[in-house]
Amino acid sequence: MSEIKQQDNQVFEAITKEFERQDHHIELIASENFVSKAVMEAQGSVLTNKYAEGYPHRRYYGGCEFVDIVEDLARDRIKELFGAEHVNVQPHSGSQANMAVYRVALKPGDTVLGMNLSHGGHLTHGSSVNFSGVDYNFVAYGVDKETEKIDYDVVRELAREHKPALIIAGASAYSRIIDFEEFKAIADEVGAKLMVDMAHIAGLVAAGLHPNPVPHADFVTTTTHKTLRGPRGGMIICKEEYAKAIDKMIFPGIQGGPLMHVIAAKAVAFGEALTADFKAYQQQVVLNAKTLADALTEKGLRIVSGGTDNHVMSIDVTSFNITGKVAERALDDVGITTNKNTIPFDKESPFVTSGIRIGTPAVTTRGFNEEDMKEIASIIADVLAHPEDENVKHDAKVRVRAITEKYPLYK
């Protein structure tokens, strides 16, 4: 980064400090990960200079013959990974991917069935403060109060009652396997289209560790970071019958020129996802998550739904007589990064919460193993039991640094 330091020392210092934070902290935010050096190099390449409105071999600008190669590679690799009929890799984010699907599949005011945000859904699945909840009539399904798992019978009853035009499966804080085949059966019964937002689990699906929604859904959206371990961005997979409509909705519908440097980074990440190493990585992600959940349970913390089948879990911190807000701050003080998160049937506000959400993609990328998960669980329990005790927090900082120093970032 010598050029940045010479040109703009303020930005250089901020980047340097952020690198130190990432290197010295244990990153447990479930939606974060560490991309490879190759992905970063692609995103910082000369492709950032190129405008390429349109699609490969159908551009509105000249000089696109090489960026066409990159976008074709990205699309072909996704087709191979997921068995997709059609792919659009141009969405700048998962939210824009979702917006494009809504505008293709729905008319303003149409009814949509999606997962309640407070039960593990996503902002773009009908939150009243999001465009989705403003433009469409969302009806929410949630989890069963006892099992804290999706009750497909209730989903079916809601679908029969409200006759949605679109049903959305997928979540941002749901730790169990989602039955896409059952969602498809429900959608077919009521004449709805099915969209799956697999942003959190795309890497697990690619590795064969979670059922693939592509054969069942009309549309599948995802981010390209998180478990897929690519650059920040979005993507849409759809049936061939919707291909032209989806492409037209992305460009010129809601976006202009694609970010070709990001698409290059996506292509590199998708290539990595096709390797045996990537599958082994995802297996370790799941193993680490299960180990961490079990160890936290042994320490007296309650995991929502009783455990995890994937990379993520929500922890109910009320048994320690604290809020999610307090837990997030106390853990951050010692170098463990999490996020406060509502849990099903939460009595606290989204700004306070009764839980925190944690995940294992980032720490697994660094090389953390099951023994590290047990130590992390012990640190978390100690800190949450004594969130204001400076002696406990000092000891926790030392233990955190001992772990992170074993796995230096980008070294």
From Swiss-Prot:
Its EC number is 2.1.2.1. The record marks 225 as: Plays an important role in substrate specificity. Pathway: One-carbon metabolism; tetrahydrofolate interconversion; Amino-acid biosynthesis; glycine biosynthesis; glycine from L-serine: step 1/1. It is found in: Cytoplasm. The keyword Amino-acid biosynthesis applies. Its cofactor is pyridoxal 5'-phosphate. GO terms for biological process: glycine biosynthetic process from serine; tetrahydrofolate interconversion. (6S)-5,6,7,8-tetrahydrofolate binds at residues 117, 121-123, 241, 349-351. The keyword Cell cycle does not apply. GO terms for cellular component: cytosol. Keywords: Amino-acid biosynthesis, Cytoplasm, One-carbon metabolism, Pyridoxal phosphate, Transferase. It is an enzyme of class 2 (transferase). Its main location: cytoplasm. It comes from the Bacteria. The modification N6-(pyridoxal phosphate)lysine is found at residue 226. InterPro entries: PyrdxlP-dep_Trfase, PyrdxlP-dep_Trfase_major, PyrdxlP-dep_Trfase_small, Ser_HO-MeTrfase, Ser_HO-MeTrfase-like, Ser_HO-MeTrfase_PLP_BS, SHMT-like_dom. GO terms for molecular function: glycine hydroxymethyltransferase activity; pyridoxal phosphate binding. It catalyses: (6R)-5,10-methylene-5,6,7,8-tetrahydrofolate + glycine + H2O = (6S)-5,6,7,8-tetrahydrofolate + L-serine. Catalyzes the reversible interconversion of serine and glycine with tetrahydrofolate (THF) serving as the one-carbon carrier. This reaction serves as the major source of one-carbon groups required for the biosynthesis of purines, thymidylate, methionine, and other important biomolecules. Also exhibits THF-independent aldolase activity toward beta-hydroxyamino acids, producing glycine and aldehydes, via a retro-aldol mechanism. Homodimer. Belongs to the SHMT family. This is Serine hydroxymethyltransferase.
